[in-house]
Amino acid sequence: NRSRGVIDIDTMIKIKNKIYTLKKPTIVVLHHPALEIGGWQDLKILKNRDKFREIIEYSEYVRIVLAGHIHEFTDRTLNGIRYSTAPGLGFAFSSKLSNYEIQHGAEGFNLITINKNKILINKIALK
């Protein structure tokens, strides 16, 4: 499925080597989400997400994983790591609607504020 992302083995090794040497709180940014969203949106997430999560969960320093691609706002925590995706600027989807049905009025972006040990994510709606 061309809509699904895959991290190749060489890149996964590079990520692993980098993650294992972290000494500071870290934000990881991906294109495809590394967590299940639900419904038809799960066809658009990172295919080898379990291996990716296994690597980043090894580090005590990864605080959050940001992603896009699905044009839907999500914000969840799994095993101590926060995962968040952004809505789309031009159009937004919802895992609760039919495949590729546009969710009118959900367009927007995320405003991320980092203060010491806090990461605040505010979804900003376009109206």
State each model region's role:
Residues 1:
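Oxyanion-hole/transition-state-stabilizing segment in secreted/luminal serine hydrolases
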Residues 4-82, 119:
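His/acidic metal-ligating clusters that form di-metal
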Residues 55, 77-127:
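Binuclear metal-dependent phosphoesterase catalytic core
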